Structures are given as structure tokens and as C-alpha cells.
């Protein structure tokens, strides 16, 4: 008899898991999504290191239209827009497994198109979860019910399902920062390298710009701000003026910082949670939300989906605990680096900035350090 699985949330992690399970005749699955449809028109960019590309290649990612992706070869570091040094990203590549950037919507479309449309149920908000005779019974607000063997919660950073299951509020924590995003044509980028990933560190802020396909660059600006300032930044006119001043942007950015400017507050998780119900699994941001300073959000969702797929196929009866322990250990590694980067990127003291830049130049040339600090993340 097939094992029945319900996936709550059609994000990167949930869709990756669905693709892996779809190849296995031992599973029957259904994806429940609270939105009316998948958002495939958004321009948010994602970065995928080898640890995630190798998994996606198992489901045909190496055959994706090359115009929809980009393979940057270097990571360039700047301090107040003055180049410090660069890192060769190709040292982590293996054959067709290359560091890749693309629109998040392009990744979602790739994952969705490989699945049968009849496994999706939209406009579904979970209302109740309980166990009945070794089965997990789920009930939605519209009255629809289902009984499954496994429940995968993959509904994002603001996961309400986790709080519902655990009977406790697990809302993420505001980290005192706000992000802004624009896109601009690659050929309009002048002071940065439009073919590679650029990180420009500034006082209490940093800017990241990288190509997301053959024609477009994604520009993300992150600044520290308290709650009062965060509220003021909801006003688009004030926000445009603020980021131009904070990031000291050159004139090439002017026409793209307009009323279409996207912005959002940054959140992180407290600690990973072992589900109190066996055969329930938290995936992606529902498991743990990282700071964006390691660019591993999507990659870790994909990696976790692969881990869970393998655990679902083994004979261990305590699968929830096995998955939790494995994922928590990996999360600890990624989180420590993300937090350190976030701290170091935002130095404002002139002396600290000087020594940070000096140390960074030396560390980039140290292959043992690079392999330990980045290799352990980029290659799993």
C-alpha cells in the first residue's frame, strides 16, 4: 500500500520534495497551498550553490533553458563601493553542478511544470491536526479533510501551521533590518561587475547585486533599522530618499528606484522545533529562517527536501526525530556563518572596517579557510 503524504505550502522546499516523491511509486501525495495560485511573475532572485544544484539536476534542472539562469564565476567584495578582493566560485563547481542564479519564479515554474496539476489544492488554510490510529487527520477551514501517513509543513517564514500543531506561538523574530529590491538591465550596471555577484559593505548596511538571467540583475539593499524607522520606510517616497542616501547610490540606479520598489522586514527563527506529533516534518523556512547574509535560503530548502525524501524511504520508525537531528546540525553550521556575515558586513567604525578589509583580503587567498568556511556549505 502506498504511503500518503500531505505537503502544506507550494514553495521551493515543498515542490522539490514533491518532485522527488513523484518518481517513487511507494508514495501518494497532495500539495495544499493557501494562495489562489503560484506566484510566477515575481522577480526575486535566488542563489543556488552546488549543494542544491546537484539535487535539482536529479529532476532535470541541467536541462533548463539557459536564458533563464546565470552561472556567475566570482564573488566580488567592496567596501563603500571600492573593490577589496574577489573569490573564485568555480572552485566549488563539479561538471554540470555550477553555482547558479535565477529568478525565484523561474525556479518555481521549473518545479511546478514537472508535477501533475491534479495534486495541487489551492485556497486551503489548515484548521486542525490530530492523530487517529497512526494516521494524521488534517482539516481545512473550508471543511475539507484528509488522512495521511506523513505531514510536511512547508508554508514559509510565517508558518501558522507549526504554531497550530505545537499549540504555541512560533512567530519569527524581527531582526532590526529591512530589505529593498529592484531589478535593472545588466548593460546598465556600471560600477559593479554585472556578470558576477557583488557585495558592497557599508555602515550598518550592505548591497548585493548579481545577474538572475542573461539580461537582468537583481539588486538587494539591506539596512539596519529600528521599529520606528521601519514603519516610516513603509512610505515609498521616504523610502526612495532614504536608500539613495544610505547606500550612496550612483546615478545609474536612479531610474530604477521608483514606485515599484519592493521592500520587506527581515525575520529569523528562535530555534528549530521537534514536532510533538510523529511523522510531522517542518521544511524550509518553516523549520528555520536564516538571515540572508549567506544566500542559502532556497538552497537549504532544497537540501532539506532531499534529506527528508531519503529518510521517508528508510525503515527507521522515528523518522521525525531522525530528520530533525540531521537538519538541526546542518542548520547550526549555516546559521553561525550567516550571523557572522551579517555582523561583519555592517561595520561602521573606521578602524574595524580597515581591519575587516585587510583580514578579508588575506583569508580569501587561504584555500584551507575558504574550503572550511564556504566549502562545507556549498558542497554537502
What does each model-identified segment do?
Residues 6-24, 152-153, 180, 236-238, ...:
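Conserved mid-domain beta->alpha element of the FAD-binding
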Residues 67-68, 119, 244-260, 316-322:
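Acidic/histidine metal-binding catalytic segments
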Residues 85-99, 103-109, 187-262:
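Conserved FAD/dinucleotide-binding core of flavoprotein oxidoreductases
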Residues 37-55:
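Conserved N-terminal glycine-rich FAD pyrophosphate-binding loop of Rossmann-like flavoproteins
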Residues 22-42:
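Glycine-rich FAD pyrophosphate-binding loop
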Residues 358-380:
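C-terminal auxiliary extensions adjacent to catalytic cores
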Residues 13, 37, 158:
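Conserved Rossmann-like nucleotide-cofactor binding loop
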Residues 5, 22, 49-165, 170-183, ...:
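Conserved N-terminal helical subregion
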